[in-house]
């Protein structure tokens, strides 16, 4: 199977980064004296996950551009993925991978890789990570809400669906999950990465906090959405490598 210098990094699951970060907290104990660490640890892990995902996407683009000169021209001249942090960049690279696979195997459809079992395995693994970590102590109420409600926004119908009629792109997520990404992942990423949480005007106001669906703004949902995107992109990249000639 073809391999590049980026392959190992791209195929390293972000869920392992989450596991390692939470494992590092085991020595802190679970008494009340550990609670001040909660926001620092969860925010630091969030930034590590978003940063790693952005670097992965850049590496995927470079690997595609190394093999496909037409894609290289398109990537360098017409695509504007920036830091690869927003929705358009993630959905764009998702489609770039699909098109790269379809150039070799024209019958390929993403539904061949992504089904209910694929999603169930990911969600079960993530939930096990949460339940075996200090988060079950620090964020017990938020975890209970997550367990009771994650299936309402994260389902097989929300990921990797077929193209809509007259559309040229495949949707990575349907509108419900896409909106959640932008609301609870991307917006929070910008607050944390640019340190705008230090400005009161950038914080959610009381009206936003009082809304019934504000409880989705938790690190449990943020981590899950990031890891779900990562798992989808890894599966596509692995499929791409498996059908690419060893010498290109």
Pin down the residues of each PLM region:
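Generic hydrophobic secondary-structure signal
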Residues: 46-49, 53, 57-61, 109, ...
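Intrinsic-disorder-associated interaction segments
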Residues: 3-7, 11, 46, 86, ...
């Amino acid at each position: 199977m073809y391999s590049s210098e980026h392959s190992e990094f791209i195929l390293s699951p972000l869920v392992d980064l989450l596991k390692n970060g939470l494992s590092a907290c085991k020595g802190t104990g679970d008494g009340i004296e550990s609670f001040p660490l909660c926001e620092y640890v969860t925010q630091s892990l969030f930034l590590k996950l978003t940063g790693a995902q952005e670097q992965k996407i850049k590496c995927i683009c470079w690997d595609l551009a190394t093999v496909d000169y037409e894609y290289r021209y398109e990537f360098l001249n017409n695509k504007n993925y920036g830091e690869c942090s927003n929705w358009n960049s993630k959905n764009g690279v998702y489609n770039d991978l699909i098109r790269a696979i379809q150039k070799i195997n024209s019958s390929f459809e993403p539904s061949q890789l992504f089904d209910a079992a694929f999603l169930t395995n990911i969600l079960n693994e993530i939930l096990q990570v949460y339940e075996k970590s200090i988060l079950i102590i620090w964020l017990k109420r938020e975890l209970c809400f997550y367990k009771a409600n994650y299936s309402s926004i994260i389902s097989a119908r929300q990921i990797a669906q077929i193209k809509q009629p007259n559309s040229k792109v495949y949707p990575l997520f349907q509108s419900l999950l896409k909106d959640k990404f932008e609301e609870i992942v991307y917006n929070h990423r910008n607050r944390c990465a640019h340190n705008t949480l230090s400005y009161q005007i950038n914080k959610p106001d009381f009206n936003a906090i009082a809304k019934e669906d504000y409880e989705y703004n938790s690190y449990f949902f943020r981590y899950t959405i990031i890891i779900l995107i990562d798992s989808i992109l890894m599966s596509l990249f692995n499929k791409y490598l498996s059908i690419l000639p060893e010498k290109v």
